[in-house]
Design a protein with these regions (language model features):
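S-adenosylmethionine
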Residues: 1-390
Length: 390
């Protein structure tokens, strides 16, 4: 595909998204009808689409509200002359109209790419870091790997990845690598397929390394999902690991991932929790707005509404209340989100466990200024009989 044809394909996908389809569904629909598109073409179209959605507010200001307008704005923001790609030749988009040829007299403003209703809250919550964080969220997120130190060391993993054409660099955290070249080859690499590495953001790796996990005993990942944090805990503790999720299908891949990593983990249904409790530590990485991951999942910020944020707050409080009942006296409760919002972080803990006799241990926050996703972590402990009732 020519560069112009890729832009035309991105316009079609964006129009489908603006009509209500998810980005993934729109991309899949395009790919099925574009059998001529190679893997590099599909990757390029996907990048164009995600870049435009990530900066939808500014792209619209610089080009228009349609798929064509968003791509026109994206090219202008990138400093690329759109007329070089909007030629009408072959499969390229039609040439610019007289109106489109004149760029709008506007300045780039990163806050345009935050939903308007959320801007005052985000500015207040992020305080002096608000502007630089919102600016950082304009750009693609880096990809990080966690080295499975049970099976390999960083040097061995780097050598293996290089053989598959994947270049990485070390980070300040031992056992974490940043992928800087050929990230799309990763899932077919020997290191990934044999469990030497897992894809995991740096903030999550730092958080899991910072928690005071019990060295033995029993640890429950209450909102396990795919089990990334369950596997990370195994690098930090010899405790027996248990995983639970309110939607069990989310854990479908966990047994295979654990086996590949050489880790034993027991999956529990909700009805099984009481007879396996109590646990020495319970981790709750609760469902949230995902505002800390909007670089990676830009569609999510445009889906979020005030009502949905309020629903999430209620759900988070219920999960914390339910999960805290499973912690042994003197045990540890670990609360995590990938949110930048105080309403999903400090406010949840203040409204639940702090009012019920728990002691607040270290709280940590990570943002894109730390070269990672936005992430929140707090640990809590109860010194005696745990009071978790309403």
């Amino acid at each position: 595909m020519t560069p112009g044809a890729r832009v035309a394909a991105a316009i079609g996908v964006l129009d489908a998204w603006l009509s209500g389809e998810s980005i993934d569904r729109a991309l899949t629909g395009w790919a099925r009808g574009a059998r001529y598109a190679g893997s590099k073409d599909r990757a390029a179209v996907r990048d164009l689409v995600f870049d435009a959605v990530r900066r939808k507010g500014n792209c619209a200001a610089f080009g228009g509200e349609t798929g064509r307008g968003l791509m026109l704005g994206h090219l202008r923001l990138q400093g690329q002359p759109p007329e070089a790609l909007f030629t009408g030749e072959g499969y390229a988009p039609a040439p610019l109209s007289a109106t489109e040829q004149t760029p709008p007299a506007v300045a780039h403003d990163p806050w345009r790419d935050v939903p308007g209703w959320l801007r005052p809250t985000l500015r207040a919550d992020l305080d002096v870091d608000a502007d630089p964080i919102v600016e950082a969220m304009q750009h693609r997120a880096p990809l990080y790997l966690r080295v499975n130190e049970r099976k390999a060391n960083v040097e061995l993993v780097e050598e293996s990845l290089v053989k598959d054409g994947i270049k990485t660099t070390k980070t300040d955290l031992a056992g974490a690598l940043a992928v800087v070249e050929n990230a799309r080859r990763l899932r077919q690499s020997t290191a990934y397929l044999t469990g030497l590495v897992e894809i995991q953001d740096l903030s999550v790796q730092i958080a899991c390394a910072a928690v005071g996990w019990p060295p033995s005993g029993r640890i429950l990942d209450f909102c396990a999902g795919g089990g990334g944090k369950t596997l990370a805990i195994a690098d930090r503790s010899a405790a027996s690991l248990f995983a639970h999720d309110a939607v069990p299908v989310r854990m479908t891949d966990l047994p295979a991932r654990a086996a590949r990593a050489g880790i034993s983990c027991t999956l529990l249904a909700t009805d099984d929790l009481p007879r396996h409790a109590p646990f020495d530590a319970v981790l709750c990485d609760v469902p949230c707005s995902g505002s800390g991951t909007w670089r990676r999942d830009p569609e999510a910020k445009w889906r979020l509404t005030p009502d949905r944020l309020a629903e999430l707050g209620q759900l988070q409080r219920q999960i914390v209340t339910d999960a805290a009942r499973l912690v042994a006296p003197g045990g540890r409760f670990v609360y995590m989100t990938c949110s930048l919002l105080r309403a999903e972080n400090e406010a949840v803990i203040e409204d639940t466990l702090l009012a019920r006799g728990w002691t607040l241990l270290p709280t940590r926050r990570y943002t894109p200024l730390d070269a990672s996703d936005g992430f929140f972590l707090t640990e809590m402990q109860h010194s005696g009989q745990i009071a978790t009732g309403p």
